[in-house]
Structures are given as C-alpha cells and as structure tokens.
Amino acid sequence: SITKIKAREILD
C-alpha cells in the first residue's frame, strides 16, 4: 500500500 510508504517518508 502506498499510504504506508508515504507515512514512512514523512516521519523519516
């Protein structure tokens, strides 16, 4: 799912 990837790059 792309949502998880987006969340990851935000909190990275």
From Swiss-Prot:
Dimer. It catalyses: (2R)-2-phosphoglycerate = phosphoenolpyruvate + H2O. Mg(2+) is required for catalysis and for stabilizing the dimer. Glycolytic enzyme that catalyzes the conversion of 2-phosphoglycerate to phosphoenolpyruvate. Pathway: Carbohydrate degradation; glycolysis; pyruvate from D-glyceraldehyde 3-phosphate: step 4/5. One of its GO terms (cellular component) is cytoplasm. The gene is ENO3. The lineage of its organism: Eukaryota, Metazoa, Chordata, Craniata, Vertebrata. GO terms for molecular function: metal ion binding; phosphopyruvate hydratase activity. Belongs to the enolase family. GO terms for biological process: glycolytic process. This is Beta-enolase. Its main location: cytoplasm. Signal peptide: none annotated. Keywords: Allergen, Cytoplasm, Glycolysis, Lyase, Magnesium, Metal-binding. Transmembrane segments: none annotated.
